[in-house]
Amino acid sequence: SPTCIRSGQPCPYNENCCSQSCTFKTNENGNTVKRCD
């Protein structure tokens, strides 16, 4: 079975995250990426 993605790691969907929450964050380069909360 798939393991959940930890906080701070890139994610496609909320369901992939251990926290069940994947939101857009701005990284150090100013790019917007979805990461687990």
UniProtKB/Swiss-Prot annotation:
GO molecular function, one term: toxin activity
Ranges annotated as spanning the membrane: none
Annotated S-S bridges: C4-C18, C11-C22, C17-C36
Pfam families assigned: Omega-toxin
Tissue note: Expressed by the venom gland.
Keyword Disulfide bond: yes
InterPro entries (UniProt xref): Omega-atracotox (IPR009415)
GO cellular component: extracellular region
Annotated positions for site Critical for insecticidal activity: P10, N27, R35
UniProt entry tagged with the keyword Transcription regulation: no
Subcellular location field: Secreted
BP-aspect Gene Ontology terms: defense response
Keywords of the record: Calcium channel impairing toxin, Disulfide bond, Ion channel impairing toxin, Knottin, Neurotoxin, Secreted, Toxin, Voltage-gated calcium channel impairing toxin
Function, in words: Inhibits insect, but not mammalian, voltage-gated calcium channels (Cav).
Family that this chain belongs to: Belongs to the neurotoxin 08 (Shiva) family. 01 (omega toxin) subfamily.
Domain notes: The presence of a 'disulfide through disulfide knot' structurally defines this protein as a knottin.
Protein name per UniProt: Omega-hexatoxin-Hf1a
UniProt source species: Hadronyche formidabilis (Northern tree funnel-web spider)
